[in-house]
């Protein structure tokens, strides 16, 4: 399993999510613990890059941006966005 490491700012961003997106957000974290490379690359020009993103929630209006540190088996949450 990968360890999820939230950035201090992501706690505030998660608190701002709509209630109906929280379960989907929790499911993203569960997937990231086992398969973080399944997310899309943040930069399409660098498809194997360690900075990834995962859309979630109703209408895929949420996005988690994260960094995979393979050697440490860590996933660092960089940003949680809601565009709804």
Features from the language model and the residues they span:
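Basic, Lys/Arg-enriched alpha-helical interface segments
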Residues: 1-61, 68-84
């Amino acid at each position: 399993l990968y360890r999820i490491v939230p950035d201090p700012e992501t706690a505030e961003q998660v608190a701002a999510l709509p209630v109906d997106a929280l379960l989907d957000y929790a499911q993203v974290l569960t997937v990231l613990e086992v398969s973080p490379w399944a997310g899309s690359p943040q930069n399409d020009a660098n498809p194997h890059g360690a900075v990834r993103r995962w859309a979630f929630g109703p209408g895929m209006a949420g996005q988690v941006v994260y960094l995979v540190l393979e050697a440490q088996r860590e996933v660092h949450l960089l940003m949680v966005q809601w565009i709804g």
